[in-house]
């Protein structure tokens, strides 16, 4: 029997990319899904394309409306009576040099990629504690383990997620709370197109590394396996995954390798 069968899973950033593919694959596994993103009409389309749309509810939200986190959680719990797994997938990337990036862009990235996730996760914590069970799944990035040019704000926000959720795991393991940090490498989504540039506008173009990355289908299969195994951390991608281990033992070598790669 599939360990995730009948679990209530709340996915943020569910309107596209990894979040959308997760919805499709989890629906095939007979999970009960709550899909969140800003655009209600897009969420409806994703729901209708799921294998079991009757077991899919949508909860439109803007993750940076921190003051509404408690009410969003209350609504999410009421939809099926509980939430078993919260998949924090909403986020935005960046493509700009530090010297050419407005400070406001850093604030926007931090609000979306870090504080929005923290707000929703903290709001649902009492529910997990009450049930003595709950699983946070956080879509971070390999950029949460090491850095790369043009992604300074994105790297900073993803590094922050690891700091927060490592503490969450330690403080609430005794309450049955689990944390899985998922670190994608290059995945073929529109993340580069929607990345913020130095003045806050969208890049609106893709790059070869992203286009040649893992398919969302392949990536999500591996991610779901990690969720079922309740792994602490998982790194999913191509050869770029080796950067995590090179960073740990040979940080100067990784510095040279990343600069040589000239990845945008």
Where would I find each of the regions flagged by the language model?
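Conserved glycine-rich Rossmann-like NAD(P)H-binding loop of the short-chain dehydrogenase/reductase
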Residues: 29-46
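Residue(s) in the substrate-gating loop at a strand-loop-helix junction
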Residues: 141
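Active-site helix of classical SDR
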Residues: 121, 157
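The beta1-alpha1 cofactor-binding region of Rossmann-like NAD(H)/NADP(H)-dependent oxidoreductases
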Residues: 60-71, 103
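Conserved glycine-rich cofactor-binding loop
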Residues: 15-16
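SDR active-site lid
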Residues: 174-238
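Substrate-binding pocket helix/loop in short-chain dehydrogenase/reductase
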Residues: 97-98, 102-108
């Amino acid at each position: 029997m599939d360990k995730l069968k009948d679990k209530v899973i709340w996915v943020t950033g569910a309107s596209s990319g990894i979040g959308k593919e997760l919805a499709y694959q989890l629906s095939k596994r007979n999970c009960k899904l709550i899909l969140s993103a800003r655009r209600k009409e897009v969420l409806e389309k994703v729901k209708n394309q799921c294998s079991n749309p009757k077991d899919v509810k949508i909860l439109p939200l803007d993750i940076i409306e921190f003051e509404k986190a408690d009410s969003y959680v209350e609504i999410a719990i009421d939809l099926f009576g509980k939430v078993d797994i919260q998949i924090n997938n909403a986020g935005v990337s960046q493509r700009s040099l530090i010297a050419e990036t407005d400070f406001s862009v850093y604030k926007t990235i931090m609000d979306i990629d870090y504080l929005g996730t923290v707000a929703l996760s903290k709001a649902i914590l009492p529910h997990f504690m009450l049930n003595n069970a709950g699983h946070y799944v956080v879509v971070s990035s390999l950029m949460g383990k090491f850095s790369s040019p043009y992604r300074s704000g994105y790297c900073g926000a993803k590094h922050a997620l690891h700091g927060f959720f490592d503490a969450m795991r330690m403080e609430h393991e005794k309450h049955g709370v689990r944390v899985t940090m998922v670190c994608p490498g290059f995945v073929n989504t529109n993340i580069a197109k929607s990345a913020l540039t130095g003045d806050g506008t969208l890049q609106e173009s893709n790059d070869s590394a992203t286009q040649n990355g893992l398919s969302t289908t392949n990536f999500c299969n591996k991610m779901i396996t990690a969720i079922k195994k309740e792994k602490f951390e998982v790194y999913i991608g191509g050869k770029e995954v080796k950067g995590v281990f090179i960073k740990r033992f040979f940080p100067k070598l990784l510095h040279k390798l990343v600069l040589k790669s000239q990845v945008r």
